[in-house]
């Protein structure tokens, strides 16, 4: 995560940043192109210099190199100040073996860049309130929280095997977490809360899982370092219900990989449109991966009608979290709000 914002230090300060662009597949290049236009306007207005390096990943990399993420393309991303990605995948590549499909490139990119924290905001824009599936009385209280999900640990990255036992198949999936993995994602949760409304909810299943009990022990140690943050804990089943019943209670949710995968998808639905939802993946330092949560929309590719707002908001997140440019990020979000009006 970037260090705390200091308004006096940033006054009249211009920056030079190298951004690696992954245009992606199908309609995705159209949204990245629009996000770059917005970034260029910000650079022009504030005297920043953004330089762009193109990297290939996903379907376009398979077509060009026969590999969803060649080593040279990964290096372009690792050497950048940050990475802006559109969306990858599409029907053209669905018949490929699992390790050769576009999505494998994204997993390798996250791992190769050491990105262990996925941040996905859930925000209801007033102009789209009627599109939310929640009751008006719930929406009117406001929805503006972020799910901080551990990205490269837990059951998705544990041992997976199927064995024969007593004449039948038994499937086993292991859910490991080490203290240092929990501490680094927990710290990002607290730091994110410090930049928002200073409220953090750790979501787990500590009444059943040893991993969740370890999460709580580590989070309690971290809590001492952040006395300004109002810290609480919630079981994942209750959290899934509360996101629908009373989402206004949440500011920042931090949780493990599988729980975060499910809860962040649920959270994106209550906002009314996945076309408005950005995300970031962060690790040690300030370099991150920023992308919209929606897919590559192959059905409308080439028609210039795809909604670029989630990608534009992802660029705003990049300015805020990787480049320490909160004022510039605010300007982009205000512009989006004006367009919706």
Predicted features, each with a name:
Residues 15-26, 53-55:
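Generic N-terminal amphipathic, Lys/Arg-enriched alpha-helix
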Residues 2-3:
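Short, low-complexity intrinsically disordered segments enriched in A/P/G/S/L with frequent Arg
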Residues 63-172, 258-260:
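N-terminal glycine-rich phosphate/adenylate-binding segment common to multiple enzyme folds
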Residues 25-28, 81, 148, 189, ...:
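Buried hydrophobic positions in well-ordered alpha/beta secondary-structure cores of metabolic enzymes
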Residues 59-62, 244-341:
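Glycine-rich phosphate/nucleotide-binding loop
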Residues 45-71, 241-243:
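N-terminal beta-loop-helix "entrance" segment that forms/cooperates
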Residues 20-37, 41-43, 167-237, 249:
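Glycine-rich phosphate/diphosphate-binding loop of Rossmann-like nucleotide-binding domains
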Residues 58, 127, 234-241:
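Short acidic loop-to-helix transition motifs that present clustered carboxylates
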């Amino acid at each position: 995560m970037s260090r705390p914002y200091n308004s006096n230090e940033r006054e009249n300060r211009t920056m030079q940043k190298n951004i690696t662009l992954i245009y992606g597949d199908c309609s995705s290049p159209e949204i990245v192109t629009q996000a770059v236009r917005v970034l260029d306007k910000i650079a022009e207005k504030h005297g920043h210099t953004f330089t762009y390096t193109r990297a290939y990943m996903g379907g376009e990399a398979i077509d060009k190199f026969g590999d969803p993420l060649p080593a040279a393309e990964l290096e372009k991303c690792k050497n950048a100040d940050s990475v802006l990605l559109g969306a990858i995948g599409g029907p053209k590549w669905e018949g490929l073996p699992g390790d050769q499909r576009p999505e494998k490139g994204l997993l390798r990119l996250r791992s190769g860049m050491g990105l262990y924290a996925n941040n996905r905001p859930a925000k209801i824009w007033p102009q789209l309130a009627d599109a939310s599936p929640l009751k008006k009385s719930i929406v009117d209280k406001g929805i503006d929280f972020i799910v901080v999900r551990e990205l490269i640990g837990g059951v998705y990255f544990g041992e997976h095997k199927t064995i024969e036992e007593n004449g039948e198949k038994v499937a086993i999936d292991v859910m490991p977490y080490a203290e240092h993995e929990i501490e680094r994602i927990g710290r990002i949760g607290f730091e994110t809360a410090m930049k928002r409304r200073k409220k953090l909810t750790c979501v787990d299943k500590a009444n059943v899982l040893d991993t969740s009990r370890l999460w709580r022990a580590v989070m309690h140690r971290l809590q001492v370092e952040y006395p300004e943050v109002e810290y609480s804990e919630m079981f994942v089943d209750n959290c899934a219900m509360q996101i629908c019943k009373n989402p206004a209670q949440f500011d920042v949710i931090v949780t493990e990989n599988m729980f975060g995968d499910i809860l962040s998808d649920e959270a994106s639905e209550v906002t009314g449109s996945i076309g408005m939802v950005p995300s970031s993946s962060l690790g040690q330092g300030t370099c991150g991966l920023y992308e919209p949560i929606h897919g590559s929309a192959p059905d409308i590719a080439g028609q210039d009608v795809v909604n670029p707002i989630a990608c534009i908001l992802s660029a705003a997140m990049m300015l805020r979290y990787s480049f320490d440019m909160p004022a510039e990020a605010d300007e982009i979000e205000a512009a989006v709000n004006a367009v919706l009006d």
